């Protein structure tokens, strides 16, 4: 049947609801702990975007949420109504203005837009949402639907701040006066150092029209003042990290307040790399102060129990409740401020968990501020705003009257408070960390809600009058979102029913109260929740307004004392009673006239009657009670309720008891209970009704009347003996007719006995004659439980549990002594004749002496026996406690007191350790005088007659213990080392004590050869004597000492990480590690502690396996986590148990996927196995990686590891094999591998292959025969080549060895010469000029300048301008902005400025730092890689940096680095000159440069020439080594070097000015020249003359004489002059002028005459030469081995230089301050710009010092020394310089066969040099920072030393030439700059320009 339309609609609606319901609660939070069945909280979740801000509309209750890239509108119950997208946007933080306004040179990327400010503008019905994108622009959204009304973004006022931190900005929206419409926005924001772009605090206009051009314009702005406050750039340059973070803002009366966090500039050091301190400030402004004259800020915080809380987290402005207002002495409409502070002043981003909730009154804050303003206007103190420039300005006295409403003047502002405004601490949370706060007044009581880091809301009641002295009580804690911190915007709903709490991903609606969870009045009112009271008749905990008729008396309880109290009479009834009348009395109940019922829980209910204020009702019937009490023992407690007929609710209860007497089975338990029970002793029952007892005398009500057995003497019964047992009793009943008599029950295990008993009277009873027995002889006496019954099963009470003791005499008493020492109450004695223990009547004794009993005082046993001695050896000195075990060793101590001897030595028994008959312990006396070394032990019982004397079966030996060794012989000072002391007889005696260094060594065990003990802590390092006391013997050995060493320390663990399963190898570096034999590493994590052993290699190194931290509770996250504790168990060294210094991390174990779903993977042979997974490479710092082993079966495979997979080259296996992966302690099997062998071929295939193979074989044989013939020829060639290669290798090695030895000798001679003459350092002035102005010998700054007086005055004024930092910076920046300002100009200006400021080095350093800071900023803003910074000289700053180091490192060069540099230069020069050098090409036999290597064999001989001393012809001739292939000029150079050894180059003759004269006798003298008529010419090639050409012989005498002018020279001089310029242009390279000169060939070819000059090799550019000399050149690359030989020869000198440069302290010189200072500056800049890439920092330092200074000096030693550098030396130094640069680089050098030879040459050395550089940079970083005072003093000293080196007037004149050239641009720049205008810099410069113009 079809459904009607209406039904169909209803059905569809129901279905829709069913579908929606699950979704409505899908993302709900958790109910509170301890809660009842309350439904979960409503939530809104944002999975994609982090939430940041939340506001609630005060009329509609709608919720607006700001997030990353989104704005959401939610209903009051958190249903999503609208979402508005704000991002991501294409942006770059460096783009100012944003890309939407102006194209940006920086790369754009997808950028999140973080909502930082969310405010409701009720008057304009819009939402103001400000984000982080596009420099912090804001959007206006319509409240109804989030429609975007406007987004002002085109003016600078629209950009609030680009900082991305969400919780750092705060604003207050001030509505305009009614009718005028214009509102104001006060906004505070951090600026991230961009003070030129953003004010930190400002007041903006909010226009009615969102597109209005004046939107966000400053409320007031003129030329000097505006509604804004900026952080000065000087503050930021001193404290780059300085910023102000705005936590909370509010309006109170006519003021706007901000709570801020800012860097504490007084506690934070400007150069501190890490430690930043913060302080909280409260900032106040007048609402109507557009000029911000009213700005005041005060430190704010609170203190509790001596702990300071200074980091503000959140605040909330509220009104106090009536009670709190009264306690504070305030009116109820005054404002109070609740704040949350974290402890201390560190870690703004992650503050400590310990936090405090504090209370401030606005009245007190205003009063403090007023007092401060008044004191300042009285002229007291300073402005004291630490972060403003005018903080040191004094206050100005003024007669103004300062009242509460004062809003400031244009002086005495802005003002800072010096005293902290302290709040009242209300509540301290030490565990969870408070993060947010909100508060409100509920019915006159103040309730505070505090959010925590763990996602909870704490509800706190504030009551300053608490009797316990606690001003606040946290009465409840509920979870909003577990584990996620509550963010700042904690907001109440308009009706105060709910609290909206926000975490990063969720908004939760938390009810302000959850009274319904409390189920009783006591719980409800005991919770102290001020919202909750007890609604009496409804029996529910609720708000007052939720309780019906709550205002009527006693219907609503608001206090614990008002809870309903109920009593009942009687309080109990027997289960057998029915309908007992009960009277109930109730207190604190309302009017019950509507009627009540009595309800016994849910069992029964009865009507009640109200009479005289009492309630009367009846108990249930016995039939109804029976099921209630069944199985409940003797009582059942039930709740008796009063149930209101009005509400149907049970509203009061009292405990009521039903008791049951009949369960008691004994008289005593019956009458001793809590209830009125009676015992019927004749019926043996317990009843509540006394009438149930038939006999009156049988009724018992008290325990004294109960029948019971009384304690009498103990009952001892020998087994097998018939005897009666009499018992004492009380109130024994006389059995009545028909009742049976008494019996005794003995509960003997295995054979219980029932014996008839006779009742004598009511107090006496006898168990009749009977014998008793028990099985076995292993028990000598057996206590047996005894019961007395009558009438079959009526048990008489035995309250004392009286027992009978059965005993057997022979059991366990085989000897006389054991028999007689038995308890005398056992009638056992020793039957002498039968030699057994028995009862007397069982012994056939004919005399009394035949049976002995202990009661006979003189009894003693015969035949004592010694069975065992312990110990069996002891020292002669005595004192050994000898334990003698045996039989019949006396019965009393007196029997043996004097009867024990060891041989002749008395042994004194110790009474306390004597065991009758069985054991004697005695102390042996001194046996020193006894010669015998062993003796028998004798025991005499009373006397030594034969029957009473015992001798030991073994002899006791007297020994002399000794020791001769201790192992280990050393250990830590803290002790705890197990040592073994070796010797002989060390187990002697009964007691041993060892002391080491006078302190006891804790004994463990010993044997005859060793004692083990644990060393005590030592007093100090060094040897400690060992003393062993064995009883009275004291053993010493002066040769054996134990050495205490300093405790081991741990310096480093490498790597500083492991995985969850541990097991990875850790190299531990420290000191004194070998002092501990078995060190162990320990780790504690998640409550579980584990240890692993370590292997010690030496005192500084050991290797440990990391302990596993695997546990079920906790595992490390992917980014790693520190263990709770990590340390080392090293004997007793406590300091290493927990290492605080290490940052050791544990990463999760690798996770590998199974090989396949089934676990079995099939694989072909030789196919790689790929194992996929994650966490395979932990993201640990450093180069260490996790080492994997993959086993196929038991065979390992070759592995390649990446982040997500292991690639395993499977071994050559077939079949099934288990795959196992191991890494450290981690082991996992991803499955089994099935490897198939290649499939077998079919028969036809085999036949086919066989036929084809045979044919192929014939072909192969033919080919092989042909190949064999060819290969025989090739073999011969190969062997010949191999022989040549071997010879070549041997030759290179030998050549290198010989050359080095020879060079060392030469250098040694040179060093000796230097010791006398000294290194020819240039003076400071020349050195500086060569670096600053290379190639200019006679620079104007070296000369005095003659000028007119007015010019001098102008230049002086210009000099003063240059010392104004702002002018100089503007000057430099303006020049650099000009296109015509060339690179050369930049270098020139930098050098001129440094010379002009030579006497102002501190100022110059400040300017340089600012320029470098700008350069870094510019570099980072451009697309250049940060590593390119300082790489090239493209700015004034870079050249200034070179000059700065030039000035400051001169002393270091002279004292330290100069010597190895000069030695390297000399070594290169000497080594080069040992072999031929081509005078034309500059190529040499020995070279480091491939380009300057002669690549063919040159035959030459070494000659020794005896040179006549040019200064004194009569002095001895100087022997000089030369080569016969040297040109005449080369020979002259060598002769001059020898003759003028030690003379600076500039002070000796030049080769061109001297002639070489060969003297062959007294008169025969020949002038030798490079070219003369004898010069050989061949096919247009003219060869220079050499010594061989002139046939100069070894030992020839030569002289250097002043140049003679000859006809030949005259004729050729013009040719030389003309050819010079052209040839120079061919060979010059870009270098310093001196090096240009040095690269000019020594002889210039005559190009005009058509002939070409050559010396050793013809120029490679000529083809005829290339073909013709092929034979002599062979393969030219073979000669590259000479590079290697030369490099090996010079290696030591290169190493020495590099080591000196890269050492922080060398040759007595400390590291120059300039280096440390500049490196620290670069680190600060990197920190400022958040550059954490170590490579970038390294590169900056390398570009700054090695590249800019050292490379220049290495390539150009003539800058430092007075020397001449020739072409080949220059080429070699360039190779060294390149190696130096490569060593400073961080990039990997990938080398191949095509790499340049100079790179290959030092390829193996560079990694080592790189490690030196890294260590050098690290050592510098570790050095303490240089204080500003020390640096200032150092720079002042440098200025003083070199004050007059340059003419400053000349330098100023040179600089002024640039002013002339760019006058207009510089003046315009000064006019544009605000600070320049303030300092009137333009007018001052114009004055200089005018004066200079007049003079010209």
From Swiss-Prot:
Main localization category: membrane
Keywords linked to the UniProt accession: Cell membrane, Coiled coil, Disease variant, Disulfide bond, Glycoprotein, Intellectual disability, Membrane, Repeat, Signal, Transmembrane, Transmembrane helix
Effect caused by changing residue 1495 to W: Found in a patient with an autosomal dominant neurodevelopmental disorder; uncertain significance
Keyword Kinase carried by entry: no
Signal peptide interval: 1-26
One example GO MF annotation: semaphorin receptor activity
Membrane topology summary: Single-pass type I membrane protein
Disulfide bridge positions per record: 95-104, 130-138, 286-407, 302-358, 376-395, 515-532, 521-563, 524-541, 535-547, 598-617
Purpose of the protein: Coreceptor for SEMA3A, SEMA3C, SEMA3F and SEMA6D. Necessary for signaling by class 3 semaphorins and subsequent remodeling of the cytoskeleton. Plays a role in axon guidance, invasive growth and cell migration. Class 3 semaphorins bind to a complex composed of a neuropilin and a plexin. The plexin modulates the affinity of the complex for specific semaphorins, and its cytoplasmic domain is required for the activation of down-stream signaling events in the cytoplasm.
Disorder this protein is connected to according to its UniProt record: Dworschak-Punetha neurodevelopmental syndrome: An autosomal recessive disorder characterized by global developmental delay, mildly impaired intellectual development, speech delay, and behavioral abnormalities including autism spectrum disorder and hyperactivity. Additional variable additional features include optic disk hypoplasia, ptosis, hypo- or hyperpigmented skin lesions, non-specific facial dysmorphism, and abnormalities of the ventricles or corpus callosum seen on brain imaging.
This protein's name: Plexin-A1
Origin species: Homo sapiens (Human)
Organism lineage string: Eukaryota, Metazoa, Chordata, Craniata, Vertebrata
């Amino acid at each position: 049947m079809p459904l009607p339309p209406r039904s169909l609609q209803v059905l569809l609606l129901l279905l829709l609801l069913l579908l929606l319901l699950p979704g409505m609660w899908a993302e709900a939070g958790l109910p509170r702990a301890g809660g009842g069945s309350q439904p979960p909280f409503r939530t809104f979740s944002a999975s994609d975007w982090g939430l940041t801000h939340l506001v609630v509309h005060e009329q509609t209750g709608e919720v607006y949420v700001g997030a990353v890239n989104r704005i959401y509108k939610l209903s009051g119950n958190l249903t999503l109504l609208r979402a508005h997208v704000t991002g991501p946007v294409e942006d770059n933080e460096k783009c100012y203005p944003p890309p939407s306004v102006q194209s940006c040179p920086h790369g754009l990327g997808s950028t999140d837009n973080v909502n930082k400010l969310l405010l409701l503008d009720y008057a304009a019905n819009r939402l103001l949402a400000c984000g982080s994108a596009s420099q912090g622009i804001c959007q206006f959204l319509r409240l109804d639907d989030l429609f975007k009304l406007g987004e002002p973004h085109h003016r600078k006022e629209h950009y609030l701040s680009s900082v991305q931190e969400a919780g750092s900005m705060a604003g207050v929206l001030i509505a305009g006066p009614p009718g005028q419409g214009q509102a104001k926005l006060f906004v505070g924001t951090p600026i991230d150092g961009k003070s030129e772009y953003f004010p930190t605090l400002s007041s903006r206009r909010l226009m009615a029209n969102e597109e209005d051009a004046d939107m966000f314009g400053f409320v007031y702005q003129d030329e000097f003042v505006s509604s804004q406050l900026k952080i000065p750039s000087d503050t930021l340059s001193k404290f780059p990290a300085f910023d102000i973070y705005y936590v909370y803002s509010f309006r109170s009366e006519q003021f706007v307040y901000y709570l801020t966090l800012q860097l504490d500039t007084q506690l934070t050091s400007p150069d501190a790399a890490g430690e930043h301190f913060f302080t909280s400030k409260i900032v106040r402004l007048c609402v109507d102060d557009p000029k911000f004259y009213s700005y005041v800020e005060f430190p704010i915080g609170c203190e509790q129990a001596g702990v300071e809380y200074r980091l503000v987290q959140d605040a909330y402005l509220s009104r106090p409740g009536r009670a709190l207002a009264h306690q504070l002495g305030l009116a109820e409409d005054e404002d109070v401020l609740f704040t949350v502070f974290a402890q201390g002043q560190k870690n703004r981003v992650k503050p400590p968990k310990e936090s405090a909730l504090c209370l401030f009154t606005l009245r007190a804050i205003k009063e403090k501020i007023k007092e401060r303003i008044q004191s300042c206007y009285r002229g007291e103190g300073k402005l004291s705003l630490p972060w403003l420039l005018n903080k040191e300005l004094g206050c100005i006295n003024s007669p103004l009257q300062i009242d509460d409403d004062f809003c400031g003047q244009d002086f005495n502002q802005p003002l800072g408070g010096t005293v902290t405004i302290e709040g009242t601490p209300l509540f301290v949370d030490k565990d969870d960390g408070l993060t947010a706060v909100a508060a409100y007044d509920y019915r006159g009581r103040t309730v505070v809600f505090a959010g925590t880091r763990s996602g909870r809301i704490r509800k706190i009641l504030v009551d300053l009058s608490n009797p316990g002295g606690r001003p606040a009580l946290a009465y409840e804690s509920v979870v909003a979102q577990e584990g996620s911190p509550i963010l700042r915007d904690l907001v109440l709903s308009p009706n105060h029913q709910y609290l909206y709490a926000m975490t990063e991903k969720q908004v939760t609606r938390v009810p302000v109260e959850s009274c319904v969870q409390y189920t009783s009045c006591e719980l409800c009112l005991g919770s102290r929740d001020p919202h909750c009271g007890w609604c009496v008749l409804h029996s529910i905990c609720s708000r007052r307004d939720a309780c019906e008729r709550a205002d009527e008396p006693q219907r609503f309880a608001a206090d614990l004392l008002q809870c309903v109290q109920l009593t009942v009479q009687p309080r109990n009834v027997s289960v057998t009673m029915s309908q007992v009348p009960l009277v109930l009395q109730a207190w604190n109940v309302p009017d019950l006239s509507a009627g009540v019922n009595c309800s016994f829980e849910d069992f029964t209910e009865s009507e009640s009657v109200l009479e005289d204020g009492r309630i009367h009702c009846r108990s249930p019937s016995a039939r109804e009670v029976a099921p209630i009490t069944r199985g409940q023992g003797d009582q059942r407690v039930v709740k008796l309720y009063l149930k209101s007929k009005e509400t149907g609710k049970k509203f009061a209860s009292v405990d009521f008891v039903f008791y049951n007497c009949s369960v008691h089975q004994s008289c005593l338990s019956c009458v001793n209970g809590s209830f009125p029970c009676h015992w019927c002793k004749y019926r043996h029952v317990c009843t509540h009704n006394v009438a149930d007892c038939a006999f009156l005398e049988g009724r018992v009500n008290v325990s004294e009347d109960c029948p019971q057995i009384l304690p009498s003497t103990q009952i001892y019964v020998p087994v097998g003996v018939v005897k009666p047992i009499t018992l004492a009793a009380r109130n024994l009943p006389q059995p009545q007719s028909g009742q049976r008599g008494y019996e005794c029950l003995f509960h003997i295990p295995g054979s219980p006995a029932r014996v008839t008993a006779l009742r004598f009277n009511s107090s006496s009873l006898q168990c009749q004659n009977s014998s008793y027995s028990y099985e076995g002889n292993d028990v000598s006496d057996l206590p047996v439980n005894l019961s007395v019954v009558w009438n079959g099963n009526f048990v008489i009470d035995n309250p004392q549990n009286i027992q009978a003791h059965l005993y057997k005499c022979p059991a366990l008493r085989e000897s006389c002594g054991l028999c007689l020492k038995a308890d005398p109450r056992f009638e056992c004695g020793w039957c002498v004749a039968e030699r057994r223990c028995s009862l007397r009547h069982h012994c056939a004794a004919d005399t009394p002496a035949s049976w002995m009993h202990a009661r006979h005082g003189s009894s003693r046993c015969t035949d004592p026996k010694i069975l065992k001695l312990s110990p069996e050896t002891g020292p002669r000195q005595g004192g050994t406690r000898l334990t003698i075990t045996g039989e019949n060793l006396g019965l009393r101590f007196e029997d043996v007191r004097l009867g024990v001897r060891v041989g002749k030595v008395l042994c004194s028994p110790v009474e306390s350790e004597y065991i009758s008959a069985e054991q004697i312990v005695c102390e042996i006396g001194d046996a020193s005088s006894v010669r015998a070394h062993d003796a028998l032990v004798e025991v005499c019982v009373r006397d030594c007659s034969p029957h009473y004397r015992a001798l030991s079966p073994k002899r006791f030996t007297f020994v002399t213990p000794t020791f001769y060794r201790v192992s280990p012989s050393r250990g830590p000072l803290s002790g705890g080392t197990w040592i073994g002391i070796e010797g002989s007889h060390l187990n002697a005696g009964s007691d041993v004590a060892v002391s080491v260094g006078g302190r006891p060594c804790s004994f463990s065990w010993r044997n005859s050869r060793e004692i083990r003990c644990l060393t005590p802590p030592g007093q100090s390092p060094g040897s400690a004597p060992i003393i062993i006391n064995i009883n009275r013997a004291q053993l010493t050995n002066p040769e054996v000492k134990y050495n205490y060493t300093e405790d081991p320390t741990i310096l480093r663990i490498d790597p500083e990480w492991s995985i969850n399963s541990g097991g990875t190898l850790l190299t531990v570096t420290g000191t004194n590690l070998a002092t501990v034999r078995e060190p162990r590493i320990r780790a504690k994590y998640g409550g579980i502690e584990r240890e692993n052993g370590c292997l010690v290699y030496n005192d500084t190194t050991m290797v440990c396996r990391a302990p596993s931290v695997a546990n079920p509770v906790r595992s490390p996250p992917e980014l790693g986590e520190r263990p709770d504790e990590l340390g080392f168990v090293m004997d007793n060294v406590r300091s290493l148990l927990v290492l605080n210094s290490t940052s050791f991390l544990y990463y999760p174990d690798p996770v590998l996927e199974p090989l396949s779903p089934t676990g079995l993977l099939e694989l072909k042979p030789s196919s790689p196995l790929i194992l996929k997974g994650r966490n395979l490479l932990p993201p640990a710092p450093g180069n260490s990686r996790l080492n994997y082993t993959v086993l196929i079966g038991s065979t390992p495979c070759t592995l390649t590891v990446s982040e997500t997979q292991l690639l395993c080259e499977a071994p050559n296996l077939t079949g099934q094999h288990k795959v196992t992966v191991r890494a450290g302690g981690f082991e996992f099997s991803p499955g089994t591998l099935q490897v198939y062998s290649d499939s077998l071929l079919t028969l036809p295939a085999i036949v086919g292959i066989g036929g084809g193979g045979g044919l192929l074989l014939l072909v192969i044989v033919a080919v092989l025969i042909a190949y064999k013939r060819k290969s025989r020829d090739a073999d011969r060639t190969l062997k010949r080549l191999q022989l040549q290669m071997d010879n070549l290798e041997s030759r290179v090695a030998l050549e290198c060895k010989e050359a080095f030895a020879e060079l060392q000798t030469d250098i040694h001679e040179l060093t000796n010469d230097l010791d006398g003459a000294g290194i020819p350092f240039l003076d400071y002035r020349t050195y500086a000029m060569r670096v600053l102005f290379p190639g200019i010998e006679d620079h104007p700054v070296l000369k005095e300048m003659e000028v007119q007086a007015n010019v001098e005055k102008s230049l002086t004024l210009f000099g003063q301008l240059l010392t104004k930092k702002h002018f100089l910076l503007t000057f430099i920046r303006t020049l650099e902005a000009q296109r015509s300002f060339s690179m050369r100009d930049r270098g020139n200006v930098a050098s001129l400025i440094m010379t002009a400021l030579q006497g102002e080095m501190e100022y110059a350093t400040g300017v340089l730092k600012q320029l470098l800071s700008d350069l870094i900023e510019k570099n980072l803003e451009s697309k250049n890689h940060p590593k390119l910074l300082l790489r090239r000289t493209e700015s004034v700053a870079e050249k200034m940096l070179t000059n700065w180091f030039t000035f400051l490192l001169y002393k270091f060069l002279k004292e330290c680095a100069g010597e190895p540099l000069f030695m390297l230069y000399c070594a290169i020069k000497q080594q080069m000159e040992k072999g031929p050098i081509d005078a034309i090409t500059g190529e040499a036999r020995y070279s480091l440069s491939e380009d300057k290597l002669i690549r063919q064999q040159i035959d030459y001989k070494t000659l020794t020439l005896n040179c006549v001393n040019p200064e004194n012809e009569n002095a001895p001739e100087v022997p000089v080594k030369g080569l016969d292939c040297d040109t005449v000029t080369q020979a002259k150079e060598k002769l001059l070097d020898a003759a003028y050894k030690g003379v600076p180059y500039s002070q000796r003759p030049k080769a061109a000015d001297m002639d070489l004269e060969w003297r062959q006798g007294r008169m025969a003298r020949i002038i030798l020249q490079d070219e003369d008529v004898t010069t050989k010419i061949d096919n247009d090639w003219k060869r220079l003359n050499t010594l061989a050409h002139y046939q100069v012989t070894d030992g020839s005498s030569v002289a250097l004489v002043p140049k003679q002018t000859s006809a030949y020279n005259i004729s050729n001089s013009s040719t030389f002059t003309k050819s010079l310029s052209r040839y120079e242009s061919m060979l010059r390279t870009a270098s310093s002028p001196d090096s240009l000169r040095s690269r000019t060939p020594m002889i210039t070819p005559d190009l005009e005459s058509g002939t070409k000059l050559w010396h050793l090799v013809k120029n490679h550019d000529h083809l005829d030469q290339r073909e013709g000399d092929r034979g002599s050149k062979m393969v030219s690359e073979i000669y590259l081995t000479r590079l290697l030989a030369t490099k090996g020869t010079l290696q030591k000198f290169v190493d020495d230089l590099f080591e000196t440069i890269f050492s922080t302290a060398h040759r007595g010189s400390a590291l120059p301050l300039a280096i440390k200072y500049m490196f620290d500056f670069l680190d600060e800049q990197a920190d400022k710009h958040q550059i954490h890439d170590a490579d970038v920092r390294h590169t900056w330092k390398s570009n700054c010092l090695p590249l800019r200074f050292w490379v220049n000096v290495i390539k150009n030693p003539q800058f430092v020394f007075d020397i001449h550098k020739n072409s080949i030396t220059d080429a070699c130094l360039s190779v060294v310089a390149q190696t130096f640069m490569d060593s400073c680089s961080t990039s990997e050098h990938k080398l191949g066969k095509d790499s340049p030879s100079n790179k290959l040459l030092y390829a193996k050395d560079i990694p080592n040099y790189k490690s030196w550089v890294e260590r050098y940079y690290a050592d510098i970083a570790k050095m303490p920072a240089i204080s500003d005072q020390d640096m200032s003093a150092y720079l002042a000293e440098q200025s003083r030393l070199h004050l007059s080196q340059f003419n400053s007037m000349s330098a100023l004149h040179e600089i002024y030439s640039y002013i002339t050239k760019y006058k207009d641009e510089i003046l315009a720049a000064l006019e544009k700059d605000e600070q320049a205008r303030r300092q009137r810099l333009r007018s001052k410069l114009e004055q200089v320009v005018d004066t200079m113009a007049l003079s010209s």
